């Protein structure tokens, strides 16, 4: 029970920082500039500063342990297939999203505004992958997996990690506070949880997260209209959409298999 309380404490700390720091920034911004309008610069600062504080806090308190052991194992093959897998999830995820009932995209405009600014990449492409992986995989999932292994299992078998991974993925999806992002965030959270469980390191998950967010940034800036388009609008026909999904799966599934072969704890 103590470990579950610890995991809950990590989540509460993350949420409190994400809530109160932006509020404080807004008050200071409005008082110093005399302008209460929501600007892109203010949005970027409100998204970046809490994440920086999260990174510093979780590192300083050792809530997310860091060692050199994983990098010393020279996991270059794992990193390569992580990048391939991350790229392979993009189109299938978009296709699956289109098959689901339309969900409210309450943060769409704010997210798009951040993506239009070069400094927004620091918030979305660099800080978010590091901060979120430190919290959701390096802290919360780590504690849940530890608690899970301490539970008695029938026939002395190793307890399955699926429940801790699913719990952390669900929390990861809900914390985005945007229903339209939750299905993708949950599925990616499951994959990231599996990667963390197999490696015991957040470096591969940070890399995956970075590729995912960086791709969103690049696509939006190359094709700003893509946010309002479906895959059929991009590829021109239903047949081309299906072929793109199949091609992506032919990238994703072998990448996952290679990761299964290569990933190990050190």
Spans of model-derived segments:
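Alpha-helical transmembrane segments in multi-pass membrane proteins
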Residues: 12-62, 80-81, 243-244
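N-terminal membrane topogenic signal
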Residues: 1-13, 240-242
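Hydrophobic residues within alpha-helical transmembrane segments
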Residues: 13, 127, 167-171, 207, ...
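Functionally important transmembrane alpha-helices
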Residues: 15, 19-27, 181-235
């Amino acid at each position: 029970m103590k470990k579950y309380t610890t995991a809950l404490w990590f989540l509460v700390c993350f949420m409190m920082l994400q809530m109160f720091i932006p509020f404080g920034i807004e008050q200071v911004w409005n008082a110093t500039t005399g302008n209460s309008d929501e600007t892109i610069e203010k949005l970027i600062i409100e998204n970046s500063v809490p994440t920086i504080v999260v990174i510093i806090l979780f590192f300083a308190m050792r809530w997310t342990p860091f060692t050199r052991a994983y990098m010393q194992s020279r996991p270059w093959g794992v990193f390569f297939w992580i990048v391939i897998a991350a790229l392979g999830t993009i189109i299938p995820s978009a296709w699956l999203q289109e098959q689901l009932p339309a969900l409210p995209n309450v943060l769409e405009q704010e997210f798009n505004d951040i993506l239009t600014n070069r400094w927004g990449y620091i918030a979305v492409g660099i800080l978010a992958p590091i901060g979120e992986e430190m919290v959701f995989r390096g802290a919360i999932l780590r504690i849940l997996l530890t608690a899970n292994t301490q539970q008695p299992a029938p026939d002395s078998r190793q307890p399955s990690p699926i429940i801790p991974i699913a719990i952390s993925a669900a929390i990861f999806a809900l914390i985005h506070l945007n229903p339209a992002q939750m299905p993708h965030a949950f599925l990616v959270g499951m994959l990231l949880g599996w990667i963390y469980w197999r490696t015991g390191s957040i470096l591969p998950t940070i890399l995956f997260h970075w590729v995912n967010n960086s791709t969103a940034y690049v696509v939006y800036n190359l094709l700003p209209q893509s946010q309002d388009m479906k895959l059929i609008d991009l590829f021109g026909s239903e047949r081309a959409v299906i072929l793109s999904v199949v091609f992506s799966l032919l990238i994703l599934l072998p990448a996952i298999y290679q990761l299964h072969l290569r990933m190990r704890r050190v």
